[in-house]
């Protein structure tokens, strides 16, 4: 596996015998000024990497919480260019990898080369495109790699075993394991077969594995850690807390939740 910002972060975290905490945040919800403050607050409270969503009007992989966040962000005038501008202004302060989560349409509208070029200029380390099939990933992966950006691919519980191996072999930075069948959203419990999927991926690839979709609390992070995964992505639960907090408390609420989750990433014992 080649050395990138993301792979180096996972290597460092593994030496610390814990898993990576990777919160998801919707850019522009409620506005980009608040998003900038929350990004720094998450970093200060133990986030190892941050997945930053580019709002899109038809987010097929997302449940109602993140759909509403995207709608609010779009209503506030958030666009890829404005997100890039915000990240450029934070570039000297953000020291952890930023991974953009975007659907194909905003990428295509801007042009793959131009999107990746702008992302690179503002310090983006990774890219997740949930509606990009494996068969169409090679071109974007090559462009992203030329800009030192990892294109991260997703594996779902319903993905056939042979295809899962191909995705894990193609994904850069880490493999994103979707823990549930369906869309993003908070869950009271995680599906039992995810642990075996983690093992299958580890048997077929040296790439780190991060589990997302439905990871909502400390118990879920402990479960992800016990499965032997390398990272936990927390999205809807954080987005919901930010949405429910008053405008004065959104940044503080995000930070306190992140700090609580970070504590659960420790004591990761490798076999």
UniProtKB/Swiss-Prot annotation:
PROSITE patterns: TRP_SYNTHASE_ALPHA (PS00167)
Catalytic activity, reaction form: (1S,2R)-1-C-(indol-3-yl)glycerol 3-phosphate + L-serine = D-glyceraldehyde 3-phosphate + L-tryptophan + H2O
UniProt entry tagged with the keyword Lyase: yes
Catalytic residues identified in the record: 51 (proton acceptor), 62 (proton acceptor)
Principal EC category: lyase
Annotated InterPro entries: Aldolase_TIM, RibuloseP-bd_barrel, Trp_synthase_alpha_AS, Trp_synthase_suA
Keyword Amino-acid biosynthesis: yes
GO MF term list: tryptophan synthase activity
One annotated Gene Ontology cellular component of this protein: cytosol
Pathway: Amino-acid biosynthesis; L-tryptophan biosynthesis; L-tryptophan from chorismate: step 5/5
Enzyme nomenclature, EC number: 4.2.1.20
Annotated function: The alpha subunit is responsible for the aldol cleavage of indoleglycerol phosphate to indole and glyceraldehyde 3-phosphate.
Quaternary structure and interacting proteins, as annotated: Tetramer of two alpha and two beta chains.
Name of the protein: Tryptophan synthase alpha chain
């Amino acid at each position: 596996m080649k050395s990138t910002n993301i792979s180096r972060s996972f290597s460092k975290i593994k030496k610390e015998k814990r898993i990576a905490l990777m919160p998801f945040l919707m850019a522009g919800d409620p506005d980009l000024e608040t998003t900038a403050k929350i990004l720094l607050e998450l970093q200060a409270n133990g986030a190892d990497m941050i997945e930053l969503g580019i709002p899109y009007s038809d987010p097929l992989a997302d449940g109602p919480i993140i759909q509403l966040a995207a709608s609010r962000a779009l209503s506030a005038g958030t666009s890829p260019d404005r997100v890039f501008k915000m990240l450029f202004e934070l570039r000297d302060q953000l020291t952890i990898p930023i991974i953009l989560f975007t659907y194909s349409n905003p990428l295509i509208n801007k042009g793959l080369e131009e999107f990746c070029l702008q992302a690179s200029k503002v310090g983006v380390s990774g890219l997740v495109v949930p509606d990009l099939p494996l068969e169409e990933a090679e071109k974007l992966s090559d462009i992203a790699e030329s800009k030192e950006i990892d294109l991260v691919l997703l594996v779902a519980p319903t993905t056939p075993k042979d295809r899962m191996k191909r995705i894990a072999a193609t994904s850069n930075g880490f493999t994103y394991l979707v823990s549930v069948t369906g869309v993003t959203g908070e869950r009271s419990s995680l599906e039992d077969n995810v642990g075996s999927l983690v093992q299958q991926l580890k048997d077929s690839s040296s790439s780190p594995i991060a589990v997302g979709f439905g990871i909502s609390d400390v118990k879920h992070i402990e479960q992800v850690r016990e499965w032997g995964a390398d990272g936990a992505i927390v999205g809807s639960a954080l987005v919901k807390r930010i949405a429910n907090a008053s405008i004065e408390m959104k940044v503080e609420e995000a930070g306190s939740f992140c700090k609580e989750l970070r504590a659960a990433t420790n004591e990761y014992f490798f076999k």
